[in-house]
Amino acid sequence: METGIGNNNGTNLVVVYPKPDDPERAERLDNILLPALRDLQEQGTKYTMIEKVSRLRDGDLRGRRIIFAICLSEAGINIEYYKLLEYFRAHESCLEGSVGGIIVDGASELYTKALARRLAFSANMAGCTFPGKPLVEATGSLGNFHVLSGISGKTPIDVYEDQVRALLGKVLDFGWPVASGEDGRLRILAVHASTRSTSNTMLLWDKVKTGLADRADIEEISVRNGTIQDCRGCNYETCYHFGEKGKCFYGGIMTEQVYPALLESDAVVMVCPNYNDAVCANLTAFINRLTALFRAYDFSQKRIYAIVVSGYSGGDIVSEQIIGAFNFNKSFILPPGFAMVETANDPKSILAVPDIDKKAALFADRIR
């Protein structure tokens, strides 16, 4: 049953649950989510459920712990979900100070991940932080739980239930990690694959970096011009064996420079031009090669940030790829407003973007 937020200052958790037009489509998620919420309530955690975006008022979701639960129709659509996206985009900072998790229940094998990435990007740009691995995704067949089902000996539906309960706890328990550098300085690894003299993205990063100099130690690594090989797909045992030693079978710049810098860092900044509406090949290889290290080390206290510059459009698509790779898959924290997304085509035209110095300074201030 839907209740309002405004007069319930004791709420520990807000569940934003835009129901699909077909009530039967929500039955599977209802049967998993509602008992988990009742158990939390019995343990002293209050929650409020919102099913209609029209009930929200600016300020309702600021400073909250939030679960976004979305059920999709057979066609992969939930009309109320799109109203939710519109609300986030129309109300700047409406999620400031909030921490979120996402549950997507699909009716087919398609659309769940794409919808979750778009939701995460829009909510994040409105101020929502997402802890590492904030998504519980259930495809129509529950086939995406096959591996965990085999490992645990549980049925896919039981694995789904366990994942939802774990996500509730993760969102409620999340705390911001402290910087690990001397005197509280932030340790940042910036990764790029651009030519500094011609790259708008690098020019923008240089402006952002200026705003970080007094409180961060920054290591910059270039992975351009064939300095990095992509992942070749070793079996799990081989990958884990090398990862335990902070290495990868294929060696090179990844094991010599990137892995040590990443392990020491508090935050990674992806300096990322838009190539064909995608992360460029060398940066994609960098992401793929992190798998060996991820198998053996915990990245859940590290933050991911991005500077994305497009020649025409599509910066949101590239940002969503970074969310999928680092936040959904590699467990990095997605801080509020994690990406600075700009458009600049001709060389050095980023310098002519209105208020670019102010924007760069504001973004630098968000890197914590």
What residues fall within each predicted segment?
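Extended, H/D-rich, highly charged conserved domains that either
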Residues: A193-T198, S222-R224
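Redox- and metal-dependent alpha/beta enzyme cores, enriched for Fe-S-associated oxidoreductases
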Residues: K207-V208, E219-G226
